[in-house]
Design a protein with these regions (language model features):
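An N-cap/entry alpha-helix motif that binds or orients negatively charged groups
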Residues: 2-71
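Catalytic cores of alpha/beta
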Residues: 122-133, 171-180, 220-239, 267-278, ...
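C-terminal helical cap(s) of enzyme catalytic domains, especially alpha/beta-barrels
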Residues: 199-209, 231, 243-261, 297-307, ...
Length: 456
């Protein structure tokens, strides 16, 4: 089989590889007197094969972003990732990514998951070092390796029972990877010339990869919307900067995997903790006496203190701005969900929202619950949804759409439901105006507490 020579390596990548080559003597010296490591017993391939998987990355810096996280503690980050990921990637390149083999060892000692050594591997000594410090898998980039070099490195990896994530960026590299026997393909969406992102690369290349292989999409996986878009083409995602750049990595991980998700009607600390453990990002606290799940501000403070991993939303039907100001003053409340009925006109809706925002001095986001089956007992028109005498599902949907459009610019999020909410019924999601999808949440029906998920 021919010995393919990689295309001209982009300058940034070439510089990194050139520098990494100068590190090889130091790496060899670092592990010179240690016994041979034991083969790995943790399989990244097995964990990824199930699908809907995430390789979450420990990374403190990158060429495109510079310093990502000043307070970088790989062990602490790994403890968070271990709750959600199928594997953990650890940067080991020191100059551009701030990595080190000690970071790899710290993560391997912390987690039960397989650990990927993320490095620019060009020599077998790097693979032995990776295994010594706890790696269960390595990254091999076809953009910097010939076929012969890949085979040499793959043989060393197999010696230690390490999985290989083979990175590809072109159709030619996909064909090479297939010929080389790769079983985990990492499609890198980043342009190695200018560091830009092209997410169409994943579906374009995925169709050329055999069905029995595992496909991972790398780079540019910034939110749950991207995950949902690319999910049909891949088994999982490798995500680094989007997580380690965030102040709250645990929250960022849940939001990436599940989207913005609110469990409403929490009445106890245990319920809040269960919501967070299930992947929720927000907890809804109901301050409405008519609700069987209503709580007092005192109880709210106890719940909030018990689960700092959630962002809390105060839910009420009140139209009194001063009452909303009192709720916004509760420490830990990050959003106010106005659940009152339609106010009779768009102008009245605007006035209510503006008054609440002014009274709360922008201390919390404003969310508006909107019935996508129209205001209670009515259907409507564009200007005043409550005035129309038309009947039927179509006009009801139009009334809900116009209500949502009327208030969208004045609120931070729309919570879309059927009727007044709490009915356990749903509406046709296709009626959600496309231009509003990015700021909407869907109120879930079913057994309480019901989830509310972002639609993007």
């Amino acid at each position: 089989m021919h010995n393919h020579t990689p295309d001209a390596t982009p300058t940034i990548l070439a510089d990194i590889v050139r520098a990494r080559r100068t590190h090889l003597p130091d790496i060899a010296h670092r592990i010179r007197n240690i016994p041979e490591p034991q083969p790995s017993t943790r399989s990244l391939y097995h964990n990824l094969k199930a699908g809907n998987a995430f390789i979450m990355e420990c990374k403190s810096a990158s060429p495109s972003l510079g310093l990502i996280r000043a307070d970088y503690n790989p062990s602490t980050i790994a403890q968070i990732y271990s709750q959600y990921a199928a594997g953990i990637s650890v940067l080991c390149e020191p100059e551009r990514f701030g990595g080190d083999y000690d970071h790899l060892a710290a993560v391997a000692a912390t987690t039960h998951l397989p650990v990927l050594c993320k490095d620019f591997i060009i020599d077998p000594i790097q693979i032995r070092a990776a295994r010594h410090y706890g790696a269960d898998a390595i990254l091999l980039m076809l953009s910097v390796l010939t076929d012969a070099e890949y085979r040499t490195l793959a043989a060393e990896a197999h010696r230690w029972n390490l999985d290989i994530l083979t990175e590809v960026i072109t159709e030619t590299e996909v064909a090479r990877a297939i010929n080389l026997g790769a079983n985990i393909f990492g499609i890198n969406n980043r342009n190695l010339h200018d560091l830009s992102i092209d997410l169409t690369r994943t579906p374009t290349l995925a169709r050329h990869i055999p069905d029995d292989a595992v496909i991972i999409s790398e780079s540019g996986i910034r939110n749950n919307a991207t995950v949902r878009t690319l999910k049909p083409y891949v088994h999982g995602f490798l995500v680094g900067s989007q997580l380690t750049s965030q102040p709250n990595i645990d929250y960022a991980a849940r939001e990436l995997i599940y989207g913005t998700t609110k469990i409403c009607g929490l009445t106890s600390p245990a319920a809040a903790q269960a919501a967070r453990a299930a992947g929720a990002t927000h907890g809804g606290l109901i301050f409405e006496q008519a609700s069987p799940r209503a709580i007092t501000p005192t109880t709210a403070r106890t719940i909030i203190a018990a689960e700092p991993g959630l962002k809390f939303v105060a839910v009420s039907r009140s139209i009194n701005p001063e009452e909303w100001a009192e709720l916004a003053a509760i420490p830990g409340i990050t959003a106010l969900q106005i659940h009152s009925p339609y106010q009779g006109s768009n102008d009245a809706e605007h006035a209510l929202i503006d008054a609440i925002r002014q009274a709360t001095d922008n201390r919390a986001e404003i969310w508006r619950a909107v019935s996508m089956t129209g205001p209670t007992g009515t259907t409507g028109t564009a200007n005043q949804p409550g005035e129309s005498d038309q009947a039927g599902p179509a006009s009801q949907a139009e009334a809900g759409q116009e209500w949502a459009r009327a208030v969208a610019d004045r609120v931070d999020k729309l919570v879309l439901d059927a009727g007044d909410g709490g009915s356990g019924t749903s509406f046709n999601w296709e009626t959600i105006p496309a231009e509003l999808a990015g700021k909407t949440l869907l109120a879930g029906g079913g057994h309480p507490p019901a989830p509310t998920r972002t639609r993007r």
